[in-house]
């Protein structure tokens, strides 16, 4: 699969209202405030060609906590006139589910947040990537991290 010409990779990241609470109820889980990614296509010569990109801000149903804003630089004023998640989820899923491989750094976090948002929308199970790759996990040995 990794050598297939014209394979599509979607490299993405989310910014959110906070951290995942592993044991917490759905209401306390973070909301997406930004969804960004680049759709790439592997060429026959093993280079990657950019096909499309997305950088979408999302208006969450709660105020963005100050601590989260200090991390990613997105404040309530930046998303006040943006579309809510329910108006953008189909677009996000088209990128995620349409790629052969979805790539992210600490992708488990981004996947968790996507799934929480889908649960809130009554769409549990709509995120179905063919394959995922976590750059954080794949670099642990390379960087000699504990």
Language model segments and positions:
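Serine-esterase "nucleophile elbow" of acetyl-processing enzymes
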Residues: 11
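Short acidic, Gly/Ser-rich segments with clustered Asp/Glu that frequently serve as metal-coordination loops
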Residues: 14-23
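Metal-dependent phosphoesterase core characteristic of DEDDh/y 3'-5' exonuclease domains
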Residues: 2-8, 28-74, 93-146
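Glycine-rich, highly charged phosphate/nucleotide-binding loops
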Residues: 80-90
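Surface-exposed cleft-lining segments at the edges of enzyme active sites
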Residues: 76-78
């Amino acid at each position: 699969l990794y050598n297939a010409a014209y394979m599509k990779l979607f490299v993405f990241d989310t910014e959110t209202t906070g951290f995942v609470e592993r044991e917490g109820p759905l209401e306390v889980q973070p909301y997406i405030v930004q969804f960004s990614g680049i759709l790439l296509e592997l060429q026959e010569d093993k280079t990657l060609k950019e096909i499309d990109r997305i950088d979408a801000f999302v208006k969450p149903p709660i105020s963005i906590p100050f601590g989260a804003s200090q991390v990613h630089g997105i404040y309530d004023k930046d998303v006040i006139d943006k579309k809510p998640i329910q108006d953008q989820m189909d677009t996000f899923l088209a990128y995620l589910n349409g790629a052969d491989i979805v790539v992210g750094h600490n992708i488990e976090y981004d996947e968790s947040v996507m799934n929480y948002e889908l649960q809130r929308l009554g769409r549990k199970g709509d995120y179905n990537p063919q394959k995922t790759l976590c750059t954080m996990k794949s670099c642990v040995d390379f960087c000699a991290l504990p």
